[in-house]
Amino acid sequence: MSNDKDSFNVSDLTAALKDEDRAGLVNALKNKLQNLAGQRSDVLENLTPNVRKRVDALRDIQSQHDELEAKFREERAILEAKYQTLYQPLYVKRYEIVNGTTEVELAPEDDTKVDQGEEKTAEEKGVPSFWLTALKNNDVISEEVTERDEGALKYLKDIKWCKIEEPKGFKLEFFFDTNPYFKNTVLTKSYHMIDEDEPLLEKAMGTEIDWYPGKCLTQKILKKKPKKGSKNTKPITKLEDCESFFNFFSPPEVPDEDEDIDEERAEDLQNLMEQDYDIGSTIREKIIPRAVSWFTGEAMEAEDFEIDDDEEDDIDEDEDEEDEEDEEDDDDEDEEESKTKKKPSIGNKKGGRSQIVGEGKQDERPPECKQQ
């Protein structure tokens, strides 16, 4: 076990993350690298010359691997940018259909069905509640959407994302139609990453929502009756924060560097930041690319199928382990039973042992197979 000096100090890194200019983070990482360098030199010095030569060869191979990986990341970024450009016309078509600016022509057989009995609704354009339904069908997002939120999310026209180059990260954009809840037409959420290839979040920033009076969904009004005999007969009103999807645009705030926070609060803050990033990455990686599949529920069924497969594999492994344990228990019971029935004599070890094994196998049965 390494000593405390050489071990990675999470609190140091957390403290460093509080500094917006990242100077503290750089120092923390430098200290960590220095510790690692010291450990590495100790390991190398303890090697024999022949082993040291082999390790040096392995390090050369690792360097070649790192060069290829850097090239892979560079080419991947170019490829991703290329396909993001190719996706855009498809997203535009999706937007037009969802919001009714483009009408899809019915196939002849579908048109006949409408003429035979179904009424055409002139007012209904596009696909109502498209994004609301897509968001609610995802397990991660649905936990954030309350019944009060649904009225506002019905006005959601589109969701887009784009990369941020400086600082590295990505931005989500939520486009809303004119609605009775807030004045904003676009709500944004930006994630600034310390390392784009690793999910190491520096901070998140969201749009301040300009709510109409009495329409704020992130707060609720509590009314309390005045005490008996009080001169003030009017109910006492109080605003209280409440759960809402729109809290997503007010991400957790990291305390100032000089502010002391206890371990429990720091852990709660870390959990909130991880949850917030999970929501953002889910919208970016799952909802936006496959919105119609989430709307229809097909994406949800596909995820459930994958989860079921994983659970079935876990069950099979557990049952295999249980079967092995049952076999071991049966063997132990048979051995104890045989010893009780007849003990081998010292003068006839071979014959005695053979007899015990034979008696043990007479009543032995294979363990039941719980699942084929």
Curated annotation (Swiss-Prot):
It is found in: Nucleus; Cytoplasm. Prenylation of the protein is required for its function during the cell proliferation phase of leaf development. The keyword Nucleus applies. Pfam families: NAP. Residues 300-337 have a biased composition (Acidic residues). Signal peptide: none annotated. Ubiquitous. Residues 26-80 form a coiled coil. The modification Cysteine methyl ester is found at C369. A motif (Nuclear localization signal) lies at residues 223-228. Keywords: Chaperone, Coiled coil, Cytoplasm, Lipoprotein, Methylation, Nucleus, Phosphoprotein, Prenylation. Residues 370-372 form a propeptide. Disruption phenotype: No visible phenotype. Enlarged plants early in the development but reduced plants in size in a later stage. InterPro entries: NAP-like_sf, NAP_family. Residues 360-372 have a biased composition (Basic and acidic residues). A motif (Nuclear export signal) lies at residues 47-62. A lipid is attached at C369 (S-farnesyl cysteine). It comes from the Eukaryota. Can form homomeric and heteromeric protein complexes with NAP1;2, NAP1;3 and NAP1;4. Binds histone H2A. Interacts with PP438/PNM1. The acidic domain is probably involved in the interaction with histones. Belongs to the nucleosome assembly protein (NAP) family. Triple mutant nap1;1-nap1;2-nap1;3 has no obvious visible phenotype but exhibits hypersensitivity to DNA damage after UV-radiation, affected transcription of NER related genes, slight hypersensitive response to abscisic acid (ABA) in seedling growth and impaired somatic homologous recombination. May modulate chromatin structure by regulation of nucleosome assembly/disassembly. Contributes to the regulation of cell proliferation and cell expansion. May function in nucleotide excision repair (NER). Involved in somatic homologous recombination. This is Nucleosome assembly protein 1;1. It comes from Arabidopsis thaliana.
